[in-house]
Regions:
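Transmembrane alpha-helices of multi-pass inner-membrane enzymes
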Residues: 23, 347-391
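N-terminal membrane topogenic signal
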Residues: 4-17
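Transmembrane alpha-helix interface/packing and boundary motifs in multi-pass membrane proteins
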Residues: 151-156, 262, 340, 346-355, ...
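Hydrophobic alpha-helical transmembrane segments of multi-pass inner membrane proteins, especially
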Residues: 15, 19, 26, 31, ...
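Conserved small/polar residues in nucleotide/adenosyl-binding loops
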Residues: 421-429
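Long extracytoplasmic/lumenal interhelical loops at the membrane interface
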Residues: 244, 249-295
Length: 429
């Protein structure tokens, strides 16, 4: 067995997708962080920081995919811990970009919401797998209580993350065959609640909005920009327009998409990376299309689609419920977040602030995204029969036992009859 086979166990397709996404990330983040490099007067500092987090995430994948997936049921224990961290973040959190979303402990800065997401997935998978412990009604309310509490704590600082986590949990409950009636009522209440909130924020007087948390002002600006019917009129040919305010990011993202063409301008030759404030994060997909063209954009999209398809195949071949729901939850969270980021970049939905998993520049988000891949690979290795060349631990133990019997036969001259008798006796048991 060569070194690659020893290191990269589990589903080979997932490994290939992970490597490609990391490669795209290094190339595009290096290009998109040009403004940061200019401000810091250090050409290499931004990409070295990002590459360090990617390397740490890669090591984490290597470690996690060697841990049997049954141990990830312990993730559910992180849920109450993450809720405490989320509760204290608004009061003692580190303010970055005007929002206290980060905590700093022993010099390490992280986002509690990212920890809460992976804990919520593990918790939901654990509850759904215990059908012999809980009734359908109990599972529904336990999941709604635990994940709903996390979403509530996340919502006012990061509404899009709360909605994303709630949607993925809802899909997990649907796949887990929770009563369709309960899910319809929950889904209907959620949709009505979001529509009412959007309507209130959109049409409420500014005096009322001023009394609410600062984050509501950001939501209002994004909703108004997205629903502005005069958007097309402002950009008539031959008319000079000042691009600023809430239009700034979205308009420059559209320019990046328009410049990309079929094959793009080649990495490092994009222009809009110098104008988009979040070119390396929220709008990195627009930079990918500008520099790699529609071909590159479709390629990245297909990587995520294939990832979801492969996760579905792994889940279908799981004999036990916990790894099945765990791998589905991790896969859905990564892919739905990726599709959300892409939809923002092409102006299909309002700006959400969601990074592109495994591609956007980040710290906690990059490491946690790698953790999802590590869990998926662990399930493909220990929880599902994917036709890999490696044996499961049980198969390896059986083969070692058979080899030991053969060695004993050769050493003591035991005949075939005795060996056959031993095999038959084992079969009778």
């Amino acid at each position: 067995m060569d070194l690659a086979s020893k290191l990269f166990k589990g589903d080979r397709v997932i490994w290939v997708i992970f490597m490609f996404l990391c490669l795209v990330s290094v190339i595009e983040v290096f290009s998109a962080t040009s403004t940061i490099a200019y401000k810091n007067a250090n050409h290499w500092a931004p990409i070295v920081r990002h590459a360090t987090f990617l390397l740490g995430g890669f090591v984490l994948v290597l470690l996690m995919h060697n841990i049997p997936c049954r141990f990830y049921s312990l993730l559910s224990l992180l849920l109450p811990v993450s809720m405490v961290l989320l509760a204290i973040t608004p009061f003692v959190g580190v303010v970055v970009n005007g929002e206290p979303r980060w905590l700093e402990i022993l010099g390490i800065r992280f986002q509690p919401s990212e920890i809460a997401k992976i804990a919520a997935i593990g918790y939901t998978a654990f509850i759904l797998s215990k059908r012999n412990w809980f009734t359908d009604k109990q599972m529904f309310w336990y999941i709604l209580g635990g994940v709903g509490g996390v979403c509530f704590l996340i919502f006012f600082n990061n509404g899009s993350t709360a909605i994303l986590l709630f949607a993925v949990t809802f899909m997990m409950m649907f796949i887990g065959q929770i009563s369709i009636g309960r899910l319809l009522r929950l889904g209907g209440a959620g949709i009505i609640g979001v529509l009412m909130l959007v309507g209130f924020i959109r049409f409420a007087p500014d005096k009322v909005i001023d009394l609410m948390p600062d984050r509501v002002h950001t939501w209002k600006a994004r909703i108004e920009r997205f629903s502005d019917p005069a958007d097309a009129v402002k950009f008539e040919p031959g008319r000079a327009v000042s691009i600023d305010g809430d239009d700034y990011q979205v308009v420059h993202a559209k320019i990046a998409l328009a410049r990309g063409g079929l094959f793009g301008k080649f990495p490092g030759h994009g222009q809009q990376r110098d104008f988009l404030p979040q070119a390396y994060s929220d709008f990195i997909y627009a930079i990918i299309i500008e520099e790699m063209g529609i071909v590159g954009g479709v390629f990245v999209l297909l990587l995520y689609i294939i990832l979801l398809v492969r996760v579905g195949m792994i889940a279908r071949r799981c004999d036990k419920l916990f790894p099945k729901f765990l791998v589905l939850g991790c896969g859905l969270l990564v892919v739905v977040q990726a599709l959300t980021n892409m939809a923002v970049a092409v102006d299909l939905i309002p700006v959400t602030g969601q990074p592109l998993p495994l591609v956007s520049r980040g710290g906690t988000s990059t490491v946690i995204s790698c953790a999802y891949i590590g869990i998926i690979l662990s399930v493909s290795r220990f929880g599902a029969n994917m036709g890999n060349e490696e044996e499961t631990p049980e198969e390896e133990a059986a083969l070692n036992f058979i080899q030991a019997v053969k060695d004993m036969k050769a050493r003591f001259g035991i005949g075939d009859t005795c060996l056959l008798y031993t095999s038959d006796a084992a079969d009778d048991k």
